[in-house]
Amino acid sequence: MNIKTLPVGQLETNCYVVINEDTLECVVIDPGDESNTIMDYIESNNLKCKAIMLTHGHFDHVGAVNAVAEQTGCPVYINKRDEGYKVGMSGMMFKLPEGGKYYDDGDVIPEAGLEFKVIATPGHTPGGVSLICENALFTGDTPVSYTHLTLPTS
């Protein structure tokens, strides 16, 4: 397994491409923005995207979901408690794309020849989850405290 981190969007949210190096299949975690950046990486490395997994439904983690799902034909996974989450000041709502799937605490999702264990980690959002794949833990914003907003530096 190999992991490529792509900082995307104004908040430079980490989008992860988790790669099965034996099959060149991958899973995209939290495609928050810049679908072109994500797709360029997938295509330039001859990867076959098998799924999109979301740690929660905030705009900076789901902004490119529909574009990446449309271009790859991949199912999108999210915890049901975040499916209709308000994601922006404009009131824009995240809607699970057709063919989307729900996961919850304790589920094990086999995708791209890898297994992703789902751990419910509510708090940042009601449906927040963390994902374990082999020796990697993907937490989204679970460990983030918002007593202040930390923005990326230039």
Q: What residues fall within each predicted segment?
A:
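Core dinuclear metal-dependent hydrolase active-site scaffold
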Residues: 3, 17, 107-132
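Short active-site segment of divalent metal-dependent hydrolases/proteases
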Residues: 59-63, 127, 144
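Conserved catalytic scaffold of divalent metal-dependent phosphoesterases
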Residues: 81-83, 107, 114, 124-125, ...
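Ser/Thr-glycine-rich phosphate-binding loops at phosphate-binding pockets of nucleotides
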Residues: 53-56, 121, 125, 139, ...
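Conserved small/polar residues in nucleotide/adenosyl-binding loops
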Residues: 147-153
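Active-site HxH/HxHxD metal-binding segment of metal-dependent hydrolases
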Residues: 26, 33-111
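Short Gly/Pro-enriched turn/cap motifs at secondary-structure boundaries
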Residues: 6-8, 99-101, 119-122
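Conserved beta-strand hairpin/beta-sheet module of binuclear metal-dependent hydrolase folds
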Residues: 1-45, 130-140
